[in-house]
Amino acid sequence: MSRQSTLYSFFPKSPALSDANKASARASREGGRAAAAPGASPSPGGDAAWSEAGPGPRPLARSASPPKAKNLNGGLRRSVAPAAPTSCDFSPGDLVWAKMEGYPWWPCLVYNHPFDGTFIREKGKSVRVHVQFFDDSPTRGWVSKRLLKPYTGSKSKEAQKGGHFYSAKPEILRAMQRADEALNKDKIKRLELAVCDEPSEPEEEEEMEVGTTYVTDKSEEDNEIESEEEVQPKTQGSRRSSRQIKKRRVISDSESDIGGSDVEFKPDTKEEGSSDEISSGVGDSESEGLNSPVKVARKRKRMVTGNGSLKRKSSRKETPSATKQATSISSETKNTLRAFSAPQNSESQAHVSGGGDDSSRPTVWYHETLEWLKEEKRRDEHRRRPDHPDFDASTLYVPEDFLNSCTPGMRKWWQIKSQNFDLVICYKVGKFYELYHMDALIGVSELGLVFMKGNWAHSGFPEIAFGRYSDSLVQKGYKVARVEQTETPEMMEARCRKMAHISKYDRVVRREICRIITKGTQTYSVLEGDPSENYSKYLLSLKEKEEDSSGHTRAYGVCFVDTSLGKFFIGQFSDDRHCSRFRTLVAHYPPVQVLFEKGNLSKETKTILKSSLSCSLQEGLIPGSQFWDASKTLRTLLEEEYFREKLSDGIGVMLPQVLKGMTSESDSIGLTPGEKSELALSALGGCVFYLKKCLIDQELLSMANFEEYIPLDSDTVSTTRSGAIFTKAYQRMVLDAVTLNNLEIFLNGTNGSTEGTLLERVDTCHTPFGKRLLKQWLCAPLCNHYAINDRLDAIEDLMVVPDKISEVVELLKKLPDLERLLSKIHNVGSPLKSQNHPDSRAIMYEETTYSKKKIIDFLSALEGFKVMCKIIGIMEEVADGFKSKILKQVISLQTKNPEGRFPDLTVELNRWDTAFDHEKARKTGLITPKAGFDSDYDQALADIRENEQSLLEYLEKQRNRIGCRTIVYWGIGRNRYQLEIPENFTTRNLPEEYELKSTKKGCKRYWTKTIEKKLANLINAEERRDVSLKDCMRRLFYNFDKNYKDWQSAVECIAVLDVLLCLANYSRGGDGPMCRPVILLPEDTPPFLELKGSRHPCITKTFFGDDFIPNDILIGCEEEEQENGKAYCVLVTGPNMGGKSTLMRQAGLLAVMAQMGCYVPAEVCRLTPIDRVFTRLGASDRIMSGESTFFVELSETASILMHATAHSLVLVDELGRGTATFDGTAIANAVVKELAETIKCRTLFSTHYHSLVEDYSQNVAVRLGHMACMVENECEDPSQETITFLYKFIKGACPKSYGFNAARLANLPEEVIQKGHRKAREFEKMNQSLRLFREVCLASERSTVDAEAVHKLLTLIKEL
């Protein structure tokens, strides 16, 4: 194999920089500030953070600086006059979308450079435009013209969900808001917004873009050289030549790390100046043996674009000096580095010198040539093929002979990949995360990364960018594993010295998986980044068991958790053959990931997972070993002592109360599951196993935050006495998945967004935790009329104090997501995680950055709770005049009001204010506790002071004893406190206890046993201080978390206040009349619904710009003056497109709003509580479930007939249209009869079957109503008719459906409409003939024929 293929050829020695050169290089690097990328100000990371961390990957292309542009050191730097601007589609003052590497599209303003006076730069074929990013702290930069698009507003199609520029991130939404404001101004006014005029790092603010070829990991020296080259107009050849002369290290074009990627990293403050100074794994002993001070470091390979469009530059030639240095590496070092050499094969040789163009890239990647990796030959770790029923797709069998041929670093990668084949492995090498083989392909295609050269697919990104890139992969459905280096080279050497036999694979630093991230297990730690939305995402674990052989009933055990909050829900329930309760659960708590026991799911459950949860990740776990049974779950929870800290004061079994209630009463140690809890505990076991696999079990379970899940309809089934359920405070209205979708409460049926939904219309909450609570209230409105009226009282109380509300709203806007911050603080402070979690051993290059983020989060939480206290203070001033009990509870302090729920946080907040220097900690990332806060730290400091004082006193005694006042202490580290005595005094008789340690001209240095003892005590105290300081942040967060209940209670109170303010805001600002719902108990009156002058809450204007027409909806109202006024079923007819479906949705939504405790858009709203809303609206099939349109209709109807009670509200739209006319009519007739006469629930039933209307026209249980329309020129020719929809719901039946009017509006050909009309007339005559024949037959059977029967026969004859 060629010498060039081995790694040590890329590690030539370089003489150490002199102090002067180091200072010069540092000044050159730190002389300016890199232009921040958009969004970098609130969250450090990404490309901008590379510059902050040190010299990292930068674009090769540099722009020429303007003449005599000032650098940050105040001097003038050499520059070249800029080239003449090229033509551009944009001009100063234009608003654009700009795209930068690793960031979403961002709204920007084009404006002239503050020093150049130009907004365009041209270099070769590249044209860049100068922009300012709309951000909380405006930043500027140069962006390629091809990555700019005109900005047309946040309401444009491309900025909405599904559009090219759509983003749900709060910072981008704020940026779009600022851009919208600028869009309404002219260009001159817009340019006044260009406020970012601070100088940036010497014109290196051109951010890295997609597809850019760049060299990574430049050292201090390289940066210094590049800054000089940047301002010198030289040719490519001369620049390369110049750089070669100045470089102290040689960058080889062959791959440096494909085969031997095990170059290690050890952070060292002494070598902090260079961003690529990473250890090679060579121990200190080896380094000391080198001829000169050498820094062995790995150069990142030159990256090439995925499409290979950029040409490879000619290879550099080594200078004689460089060659000489390279050959002087010791043989010992070479032998060590050979462990990382690339494999010897023809393909490696062929591509080792390949360039970045298409011709140099392999047509087939190396991993694609491996026979055992091909799909048809792949096996799992147990050598089972994919067609085996127990095949484990998450593992891979890797032949042992292949592993033996790998380099140590790549062998470790394959070992990790073989156990986690379904994960994208982010493999830490130095300060970069590397992606290899199939993972590299994903990185290039999904993240826009670029391939490194060679026949192995290989890409990567810096440590600081992990949060951004991993989140991008996770949101696209991938599972990501973060593999960290958990051992330094020194630790590796110490380990190897203890081993009897050492192989080359042992001389590799340890790496461990520190975290597996999936959609359902995101905790948003400092490494993972911030959440992009406020709502919860659930991980659901599911266990199913059929309760009878027929399969008509089944039982479910469920456990679902929001990992960002650490809150678990666990429950067990029976379900029907349609899985109604399970469907409701996944609608209320939509999971993004589902775990289930392999081979245990029924066909119906699989259908739900395949259809309703098709976008969720689904993973089957092996029964027993992965999906635990109930007994193993309980045993593991107790053995792992997850709840030790939270339940340390508890008595008996160390389990949370919810879990303790699921154990057998006869088992005092809590290892036996309860009779009706086995499935629930088994589901928890599957969840715990997966969290354990993802390495977040300790941080989540240790919160002991469990809540039992009980289906909302559990009481409605068991209650027999009419209306008894409405006296229970916890009873809720049931809204199943079908109803939530049909009423468009959360998502619309058009594009799946929140546009036009009830949630969007009502939601004006200002806090993330308030938004989550509002969604829960919408899922489950109240049924207890006392609770409903109490919320309505709260809304009225708030509406009468608008001044106070304005103050509170402004404070609410300042609150961070405290609920998630509490979970983060707990995770950082958890002693369980700090003891044995791999992350506690990980070697992190950006540790200071992460520490700063943790401190910022902590301080943000403290500030948030201070703001909460201010809010309570404002509300307490007016609380005495409030009627609402719930409002008084959430705004009253527990210490002042016995019914108050808000904890008094004043003492705790004051304590944390004085605990440490906040500003210093924010800047340094280190926490130094003040006296009195940390007893261990205080004791260590006291011991240090005591020992130091004791040593000073001892020195004074020795001076007096020897008679020399010039005796001083000398030494550093563990050799401190040597008595330095002038030589002329040492000739006298010194005490025998004096032990000579060292000498120098003119004096000698001594130790005594007393000094050694006192020094040992001092060193011990210093070590205790350092240990205490190192663990200070964790212990500080842990102490804060001890009061979790108080902090969480405060969050819950403010969440309720935020939602009440939201409802008050809607109630006060609705379009048109708003009224307070009147809720009456069923004991006082039969069930009824009265809506007068009601409007659809989500539609204020029609599409034609007309005002929405209010309507009266009366069902079962006593005051209605007609014979069938108490009818519970209303048949709704009317023309097509006349508004029937809208009317029915309107009734359902207003009922939901009324019982949620909100004002409704109506003049009058009176009702008895509704226990459940059923809907059968729209017509669609379920392809994924294999269900036809008609089957879907009947399934939803069957659920209604099975579960509806007299207190339900049923909305059925055109049942029976999915089958033959007579079949559909018959089914609709039977359903109406069942609903009206048997169940007697409030029903709106729309239909176009006019025979159905005739059948029930005289039925006292059914009332008729229709959507009015006005017909002009009504005649036999439908083309001459003009139909005007009045959208008014009135009494009686509509004579026709006017379907041909809809056909004409849909632009059907006129001849088709005419033919259809003639055919319709034939059908009508045939139907009338049949009716006449039936009446004649009935009349002939009667003994006498009355006048009414004769009149009916004559009428039918006349119609014919």
UniProtKB/Swiss-Prot annotation:
Phenotype for K1140R: No effect on mismatch binding, complete loss of DNA repair function
Effect of L396V: In LYNCH5; benign; normal mismatch repair activity
GO cellular component terms attached to this protein's record: chromatin; cytosol; Golgi apparatus; intracellular membrane-bounded organelle; MutSalpha complex; nucleoplasm; nucleus
Annotated region (Disordered), positions in chain: 1-84, 195-362
PROSITE patterns hit by this protein: DNA_MISMATCH_REPAIR_2, PWWP
Location, primary (coarse class): nucleus
Extent of Basic residues compositional bias: 240-249
Positions contributing to ATP binding: G1134, P1135, N1136, M1137, G1138, G1139, K1140, S1141
Impact reported for C1158R: In CRC; uncertain significance; somatic mutation
Compositionally skewed regions (Basic and acidic residues) per UniProt: 263-273
The keyword Cytoplasm belongs to this UniProt entry's keyword annotation: no
PTM characteristics: The N-terminus is blocked.
Reported effect, E1193K: In LYNCH5; decreased mismatch repair activity; displays marked impairment of heterodimerization with MSH2
Effect of L449P: In CRC and ENDMC
Reported impact of K295R: In multiple colorectal adenoma
UniProt modified residues of type Phosphoserine: 14, 41, 43, 79, 91, 137, 200, 219, 227, 252, 254, 256, 261, 274-275, 279-280, 309, 830, 935
Annotated GO biological process: determination of adult lifespan; DNA repair; intrinsic apoptotic signaling pathway; intrinsic apoptotic signaling pathway in response to DNA damage; isotype switching; meiotic mismatch repair; mismatch repair; negative regulation of DNA recombination
Keyword Transcription regulation: no
Reported impact of K728T: In LYNCH5; uncertain significance; no impairment of heterodimerization with MSH2; normal mismatch repair activity
Result, substituting Y103A: Abolishes binding to H3K36me3 and DNA mismatch repair activity
Quaternary structure and partners: Component of the DNA mismatch repair (MMR) complex composed at least of MSH2, MSH3, MSH6, PMS1 and MLH1. Heterodimer consisting of MSH2-MSH6 (MutS alpha). Forms a ternary complex with MutL alpha (MLH1-PMS1). Interacts with MCM9. Part of the BRCA1-associated genome surveillance complex (BASC), which contains BRCA1, MSH2, MSH6, MLH1, ATM, BLM, PMS2 and the RAD50-MRE11-NBS1 protein complex. This association could be a dynamic process changing throughout the cell cycle and within subnuclear domains.
Annotated domain remarks: The PWWP domain specifically recognizes and binds trimethylated 'Lys-36' of histone H3 (H3K36me3).
Designated name of the protein: DNA mismatch repair protein Msh6
Lineage, uppermost ranks: Eukaryota, Metazoa, Chordata, Craniata, Vertebrata
